[in-house]
Amino acid sequence: MTRVAVIGAGITGLSSAFFIKKNYPEVDVTIYEATNRPGGKIKTEKRDGYVIELGPESYLGRKKIMTDVAREIGMNEDDIVTNQTGQSYIYAQNQLYPIPGGSILGVPTDIKPFISTKLITLKGKIRALKDLTMKPISITEDDISVGHFFRARLGDELLEKLIEPLLSGIYGTDIDQLSLMSTFPYFKSLEEEHGSIIKGMKQVRRERQKNENNNRVGAQGQFKQFKQGLYDFILKLEAWLKAREVTIEYQTTVKDLSSTQQGYNLIFENDNTIFYDGVIVATPHQVFQKWFENDPMFDYFKSLNASSVATIAMAYDNANIENYENGTGFVVSRTSQTDITACTWTSKKWPHTTPKGKTLIRAYIGKPGQRIVEDCTEEELVQIAQRDLSKVMKFQGSPDFTIVNKMIQASPQYHVGHISKIKEIQAHIYDNYQHLQITGAPFEAVGLPDCILQAQNAVEKLIPRIR
């Protein structure tokens, strides 16, 4: 019998085991997890009728692989919810500005609301519209920073006031260092195909509207979640795996890997050794890079920085809080003097998460290059969030409760050149480590469906070679 070890029980590791048992049910699978729980960054807390996400909030619905897996592990349509649509805002120049209608990731596709917005000056609007007549931007070494690309296409002002707040929060990276081809390569493809980012995104918008019309569905949110929280997905996935005789060993740390001609010996903290025909590594890069110190190809991961972020959830009685605006949340421009980077009015965006008569807010703290998350206590982070939020909202009294979740060095920073280096490393692994695959956020996109897709790809690269 072929035996495979999966190291790491986050969503990538669990999904790796899922695809092994789905497509190769005869393979014996054991998952090793250093902590006492599955799910990695996914954490949901239920309290007093609230469903509170402390890690990732949701996933992009058009990336259907996560919804497909949810159905396969026994979740039904009633378990899956879509976010409420509503106005989103940019906090800039000490006030909230509505994100102009028709904007997609900050790129204008409807000229009228873009021209009428007060967020961008007339000079900034004229500069952005030059995109319509510019030639494609040439790039060297097959990559360019997101900041460089959008500055060249749309100008500094639109980038800094609209695009940067929306994009940098996803990856926690300085936009002038963030790799375009590792994160948003389709922007470059649209530019080359249509000669303009604005024209390209207008076509994307038309296609989305056409699909909505064909499906006879009105305006819907882009994001999905689960009624009982994202962690419900993790627990059901864990149960599905256990029902198929997958063993999950918690609080078990793999200290090292030792290769043989037939596979790998896993060496544990107590120096016990267990042999496996194949191994899938789905841990943070800070963990696995030390196992390959003798291979210079893995030196890249020593210099791969990761950013920290804290989420601060605050629950209030409706009588004790006043939103100035009726919307789902806001992101903060880089020029604003705040420590929070974004805020979600969760009770409006996800009504199922909050009891009637209550308001749930989630603030985010953590900017590239800062150490505020590492250096501040949880109480200090709550005070910082309340200080910054008081600039746009009125609070009376204290919240019913607050919950802080620190995610230290949790988001790998994809700097320019990342994707070409990762492709080189992946080819090296395939050519030189027949019994091994390494996957997860250090390699490619960090969204939950992307992690599941990477797991599927890792399984299909590994299992046929070792059976």
Predicted regions span which residues?
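Conserved Rossmann-like nucleotide-cofactor binding loop
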Residues: T12, R37, Q286
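Active-site/ligand-binding neighborhood in enzyme catalytic cores
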Residues: A128-T252
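Conserved flavin/dinucleotide-binding core of flavoenzymes
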Residues: G101, N326, W345-R467
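Mid-domain catalytic core of redox enzymes
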Residues: T253-I361, P368-E374, K391-V392
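Glycine-rich FAD pyrophosphate-binding loop
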Residues: K21-R47
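Short loop/edge segments at beta-strand edges and connector loops
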Residues: N83-Q84, Y250-T252, S258, G440
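N-terminal Rossmann-like FAD-binding beta1-loop-alpha1 element of flavoenzymes
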Residues: T2-I31, I463
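Dinucleotide-binding Rossmann-like beta1-alpha1 core, especially the glycine-rich loop
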Residues: D48-I137
